[in-house]
Every structure is written in C-alpha cells, then in structure tokens.
Amino acid sequence: GPGTGTPTYTIQGDINIALRGGHGEFPRIVVIPGDPNEAIEKTNEAFYLSEKFNSLSIVLSDKHLAESEFSVRGKPNKTIIPKINRNIPGKTIVKASGYEHDKFGNTTEDATLLKRNAEARIIKYQKIKKEAKRFEMIKIHGKKNSKNLIIGCGSTKGAILDAIEGKDFKFLQVLYLMPISDEIRKEIKKAKKVILVENNLTGQLGRLIREKTGIKIKNR
C-alpha cells in the first residue's frame, strides 16, 4: 500500500505508482478502503473483478489504517465468490508469455493481431468500469445537501468525519481510484466550495480527479 513515509508515521504517497506503474497500456483495478469493513469489502470486490476480467487488482492500505483501533459497526457486505474461468495448471496445458501472443499463448508479431489485442485491453477497461458500478465506488457522508464539499480517500476518512461532525459539510469518499466514478464530477459541479484532503505533498488524488473530470481543485 502507500509507503509508511517517516518511520512510525504514514503517507498516501504511492497513488501515482499504483495507477500508472507497469509496462504498456493495460487495465487494472485500484481500490482504497478507509476502515476495516471497507478493507474486507473492497478486497473481496478486487478479487472478484480480477478473476472475472483476468486483470491486475491493487488494494491500497497504509500504516494508519493497518495499525489503528476501530469501533466497527455492522458487518461487511456478503462475500462475492468469483467464478474461476481460467485454465488451471495440472488440468490442462497453460502457456504464459510476457511477449505479445495469440489465444493459444504462442508469441506473435502479426500487426493485425497486435492491434486487436491492444484494442481488446482498452475495451476490457470499459467492461471493468461497467461491472464496478454494481459496487460502492464512492460514499457521501455528512450533510448530503450541503454546498461545501470535502474530497478524500483512504485513512483520511476518520479525521475528516471527526472534523465535519455538526458542521455544514459533506464528505465525498473515493473508494475506487481505477476505474473512477463519474459521480465525482457531478458532486463537484453541485458544490460552491470544494476542499481536497490527502496525506501527500503533490495532491495525487487531485491530479487524478483533474485528469478524469477536467476540474482543478485549488483548495487542498
């Protein structure tokens, strides 16, 4: 998860590498829970999406979330059991190649097939996003009709909830960084004042929101 930063402390410094690290253009799922229940739920969802779409999932935790004490209310959502549709070694021949390959696992440099594979990976991302909408990609806390909006993710959740208690604010908690919810742009558009809260210097969540919505959040 996000690096521990200064020893014994925490930081949300690895959002960018989780979203963009790797070779080439390929879909991935990145979730960022804010409490123990969400950690269980989002990890389960990540496994489900990984198995369904044969894609990489990353669950971003951090030291604060991992080592804090929580009073947990309620139980996590019912576990989703993913269906395993891939070939299992020992039952059939399985070929794995880091090179571009055909459906049989054989390496190829055929231009038509390379183009088709690249396009298929982008189409897969759209399918992942559509499927992820069945889950909570964001949560709205506080006064739902407030025009004062705070945006955050991960372990900043607890501090933000304490800060807005009894005040005219609502808190948009981002749970999916990739795919990211289209509702974020709608919520920002409805607000008069938007504040971004994240535990890093460069505003990595803010960069992602600007990239996907075209909106730069100045107050952070």
Q: Which sequence ranges carry the predicted segments?
A:
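Short linear motifs at secondary-structure transitions and domain/linker junctions
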Residues: G3-T8, I32-P36, I122-K127, F169-L172
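Flexible, low-complexity linker and terminal segments
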Residues: K42, F47-R220
